[in-house]
A protein has these predicted regions:
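Extracellular S/T/G-rich loop segment that most often corresponds to the catalytic His/Ser-adjacent loop
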Residues: 184-254, 258, 262
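Active-site/binding-pocket entry motifs
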Residues: 55, 71-72, 77, 118, ...
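Subtilisin-like peptidase catalytic core
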Residues: 82-151, 256, 270-275
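Divalent metal-coordination and catalytic microenvironments
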Residues: 51, 144, 248
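Glycine-rich, phosphate-binding/catalytic loops in enzymes
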Residues: 63-68, 161-163, 191-192, 211-212
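Substrate-binding/access-modulating region of protease and related hydrolase catalytic domains
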Residues: 118-190, 231-235, 240-241, 274-277
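Active-site core segment of subtilase-fold serine proteases
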Residues: 3-106, 110
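Proline-centered loop/turn at the N-terminus of a beta-strand
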Residues: 46, 111, 170-172, 193
């Protein structure tokens, strides 16, 4: 999350004078958006929103929320976590609902699953975050939106293990990079799609960046998002860029259900607005 008055870190890599023209090679140059997701609505794809929860009754979500869970810290449990079923999920801040609404706007028939790992004020432990990712991998999720992260290096290995498990189980993780100029996990792992904000408004306009630490740029400035109590607001941040890419991945996954995360990332590259041949 970010204050709307602050420019998110890494977004300057997607300013109009910084975007690099790139060229797809060989068969990659033949890939088109029509082939990738034309006619797809996300039908049959389950998208997890690992966040503050999701307001299932928000009109911007079109009734597509299909329950979820809360991952809570419990020092008396063997692994310090407790998983609570939430057939009627709620959102404790509005942030998760905002992300879910963006995904729904691109992939209206995808199923939205709430994985609540943040509490009041957007607070939560890294172990809850990792536990939520683990739950998604184990529960028939195809796409996972992560508009949150940690910059603490002590958790590098823990999140790397979960990200690898997602990769080898064909669960595509889409992660917003940090809003401040600091490394964040899991966005830095090569198995994850990392996303920052650009200033454009077209939800289908996105760019590929060949330089670390972020790969893709999607709309994330003054985005109209769903929020608490059925409301909407304008929001700015890398948090709101990631679900644009998650929505596209849901469209691709619905049309081509047997693709691996590696293949999906390659398709996104080939179809980016700054890649010739797309």
């Amino acid at each position: 999350m970010t204050d709307n008055r602050v420019r998110p870190a890494w977004s300057e890599q997607f300013s109009s004078d910084a975007i690099k023209e790139l060229f797809a090679q060989g068969p990659m140059a033949e890939l088109t958006r029509e082939w990738a997701w034309g006619g797809s609505t996300g039908q049959g794809v389950r998208v997890a929103i690992v966040d503050s929860g999701v307001d299932q009754d928000h009109p911007a979500l079109g009734g597509r929320v299909r329950g979820g869970v809360a991952i809570e810290f419990d020092e008396d449990s063997e692994n310090y976590l407790r998983t609570i079923d939430e057939p009627n999920p709620v959102d404790l801040t509005g942030h998760g609902t905002a992300c879910a609404g963006i995904i729904h706007s691109l992939a209206p028939d995808a199923e939205l699953i709430s994985v609540r790992v943040l509490g009041e004020g957007g607070r939560g432990a890294a172990i809850q975050f990792a536990g939520g990712l683990g739950w998604a991998v184990d529960n028939d999720i195809q796409v996972c939106n992560l508009s949150l992260s940690t910059s603490l290096e002590e958790y590098y290995a823990m999140f790397h293990r979960v990200a690898d498990r997602a990769y080898f189980n064909n669960v595509m993780l889409i992660s917003a990079v940090n809003n401040i100029p600091a490394p964040s996990y899991p966005s830095l792992y090569s198995s994850v799609i990392s996303v920052a904000a650009h200033e454009g408004k077209d939800p289908f306009t996105y760019y590929y960046n060949p330089d670390p630490p972020v790969e893709f740029g999607a709309p994330g400035f003054d985005v109209k998002v769903a929020w608490s109590n059925g409301s909407t607001m304008l929001a700015t941040g890398n948090s709101y860029a990631a679900p644009h890419i998650a929505g596209l991945v849901a469209l691709i996954s619905a049309k081509h259900p047997n693709l691996t995360p590696f293949q999906i990332k390659a398709i996104l590259y080939a179809c980016a607005n700054n890649v010739k041949g797309s």
